[in-house]
Curated annotation (Swiss-Prot):
Family: Belongs to the glycosyltransferase 4 family. MraY subfamily.
HAMAP family hit by this protein: MraY (MF_00038)
Membrane-crossing segments per the record: 21-41, 69-89, 93-113, 131-151, 168-188, 200-220, 240-260, 264-284, 289-309, 338-358
Compartmental location: Cell inner membrane
Leader peptide range in chain numbering: none
Protein name per its UniProtKB record: Phospho-N-acetylmuramoyl-pentapeptide-transferase
This protein's pathway: Cell wall biogenesis; peptidoglycan biosynthesis
UniProt cross-references to InterPro entries, sorted A to Z: Glycosyl_transferase_4, PNAcMuramoyl-5peptid_Trfase, PNAcMuramoyl-5peptid_Trfase_CS
PANTHER family membership: PHOSPHO-N-ACETYLMURAMOYL-PENTAPEPTIDE-TRANSFERASE (PTHR22926), PHOSPHO-N-ACETYLMURAMOYL-PENTAPEPTIDE-TRANSFERASE HOMOLOG (PTHR22926:SF5)
Amino acid sequence: MFLELINFITQFDTKFNVLNYLTIRALLAMLSALFIGLMLGRIFIKRLQQCHINQVIRTDGPKSHLIKVGTPTMGGILILFAFIVSILIWGDWSNIYLWIIIVTSIIFSAIGFTDDYLKIKHKSSNGLSSSIKFLTQSLSAIVISTWIILISQKTTQPQLLIPFFNDIILPLSVFDFLILSYFVIVGSSNAVNLTDGLDGLAIMSVILISGALAIFAYFSGNYNFSNYLNMPYITGINELFIICAALIGSSLGFLWFNAYPAEIFMGDVGSLSLGAILAVIAILIRQEILLFIMGGVFVAETLSVIIQVGYYKLYKKRIFLMTPLHHHFEKQNISEPKIIVRFWIVTLILVLIGLASIKIH
C-alpha cells in the first residue's frame, strides 16, 4: 500500500526513493509491528480480562503453573494483527509471496482460534478433538502446498537443498514436493504449539528463527548474492525479508507482555499460525532442512511427546517425567526462567549453525 504512494511521490522528488529500498522497508515494517504490539498490548490484555478469556491450566501439570490461573490467552490475535497490518503497509501487494503468507496466517489462526474458543467455553484444556484439528490442519497444508507448487513451477524446479553440502541437490517431483511441504507445515505448526508452554519460550525461538530466515530470503532474492553463495535465485522472494522483519517486530511486541511472569499467553491462535508461517517461509526459500536444524527445540519438544506416547503404549512406562520436554525439566525442580533461557540459548546456537551454512555454501 505505502509502496504505491512512495512510487507516486518519487516521480516529483527522487529523495523519497530511499523509502523504496528493501532494507528500509524491512526496518519500518519491524518497527511498525513492534509499535502496534506495544501500543495495543495493554488495552488488549484488559479487554481479554473483562471478557474472562483466560488460560485453562491443566490440573495434572506442574504445580508451579497454578499461579498462572486467570492469565488472559489468545494473545496470538495481537501478534497476527500487528504482523498483517505491518506487511500490508510496507509490503508489495503485487508480490504473490506476501499473499501466501497472509492466507497461511488467517487459515491456521482460524483453526487455533476455534480450539481456544472451545477450551474457554467448556473451561477445559481440551478444545478441538485431535482428529478434527489434524484434519483441518492437513487440508489447509495441502491447499497451501498446492498453491506453492503452482507458483514454484513458474520460477524454479522443485528441489531439496542439503545444508553444508552444496553439491547435493535432490530434485523433487510434484508429488514429492507436495508431501514434503505438507509434513513441514503440519509438523512446524504443531511443534510450535507444543513448545508454547512456558512464558516467552516459543515466541523467542520464533524471533530468532525468523531473523535467520530473513537473511536467507534476502540472499535468495538477490541474483548476485545467490550466485556468489551458490544458493537458488528466486525472483521476488526477497519480499519475505520484509515479512520476516514484520514477524520479528510483532513477536517482540508480544514478548514484552509474555516474558516471565507472563501477562498474556498467545494461545493456539498464535502458536499454530506462527509455526505454519515459519514453515511456509522455509519452503518458499528452499530451506526446509535448515528449519528442522534451527528449530531443534521445537523438534525436541515434539519428539519427546511422540516417544513418551509410543513407549507408554508398548511398555506401560514413561521415559520422561512429563511431556513436552520443558515440563520434564520442571518436574526436576528447575525454575521456569532458567529452563526458558537455556532453551533460548540452544535455539540461538542452532540458528548460528544454520547461518554458518551460508558461508559453507
